[in-house]
Amino acid sequence: MQFDHAARHSDLSASSRKGSTLALYALTLGAFAIGMTEFIIMGLLPEVAADLHVSIPLAGLLITGYALGVAAGAPVITIATHKMPRKALLLFLMILFIVGNALAALAPNYTVLMLARILAALTHGSFFGVGSVIAAELVPKEKRAGAIAIMFTGLTLANILGVPIGTFLGQAYGWRSTFWAITVIGAIAFVVIVLLVPKVASAASSLRQELGVLKRPAVHVALLMTVFGFGGVFTAFTYIAPILVDITGFSPGSVSYILVLFGVGITIGNIYGGKLADRKLFPSLLGILALLTVVLALFSLTALSKPLTLVTVFVLGIAAFGTVPGLQLHMLNTAKEAPTLASTLNIAAFNLGNALGAYIGGVVIELGFAGGLPAVPWVASLTTLIGILFTLWGARLQKQAARS
């Protein structure tokens, strides 16, 4: 009898683990769709501009509009839906995403396309914020960062596979075909989430409690860790194409292949960053941020050599996304009584870091600071160095909280 009971318990545990894994893959598919729609416009700017009769710079504002939609939508959507069960919220977000991309595919003019991009962007921060909470609740406590990393793998795969395939599709059959493809992927993700993601009870916290948590200094520091720790990546990465072409001497046509190397790096970094964060959160975060700082600083030198540049771009990818699971897990730990809004705001902080980093790099180039473009990578390392200082502060606050 004891053997039968143990066998049944083992079967149930295996079934539970399988269900959790499938649920994580469902979240990954949703993340893939959202990541694809975020980045795809970069590869289709000429086609969009020509079809809608606007300039390339004006078409480029579709990227800015999406980023602003993410930053604004993250807190607004989460606050407005705080009483909604988390699975229902995910499905609601996917419906908005599907509608936004279908509208983009049908857009008769630039204005409608911009509105469609913003509508799709409103779902971004909340999906990754709520998805992080659900992913963390699907697994034992010691595996939470790894679960978050699995979900974010969808975002990294969108860079490696989704964007190149979507760009090819758009160039071959028109940019609207790409948005129709993303709409279909979103619909499939919706069905998969319905079938595989279990109903997860919403936190018992009220809106007042959710907002109250945001008054904590530890939450502010966690957000600043994300803004500056990740912002340095985009100080350099935003201008990676001119660095590769104008400084290293690669041909413009080779840039896309080099970016695939970066994409492989961020996938590896995301997975192993999650594993390391589950073992030792702050030591791993500080170690990866230190690696990121060193790699960025050296990039100003290695950019003069093609072989060294390839190695640098790959390691940069590993270090860049190696921080993501740990930064997200730290926010969940810091605001564990009301994680949904805090987690979502941390996604907005990643995007704020992207915008801040791009702005800093642009200022360096525009002003010709220390030679302009060649100085961008080492200036980026100073941004991540600030992130390290905030991470040390965050570690100190966590120790103080543990003692109290």
Located regions from the model:
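Paired small-residue
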Residues: 96-103, 111-120, 307-315
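C-terminal transmembrane helical hairpin of 12-TM major facilitator-type secondary transporters
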Residues: 283-327
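Conserved MFS/SLC helix-loop-helix module at the cytosolic interface between two early adjacent transmembrane helices
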Residues: 72-111
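Helix-loop-helix hairpin linking two adjacent transmembrane segments in secondary transporters
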Residues: 108, 112, 140-195, 239, ...
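Helix-to-loop junctions at the C-terminal end of transmembrane segments
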Residues: 74-85, 269-281, 365
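A membrane-interface helix-boundary motif in multi-pass transporters
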Residues: 171-183, 363-384
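Cytoplasmic helix-loop-helix junction between adjacent transmembrane helices
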Residues: 116-154
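Helix-breaking motifs and short loop linkers at transmembrane-helix boundaries and internal kinks
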Residues: 53, 85, 106-112, 249, ...
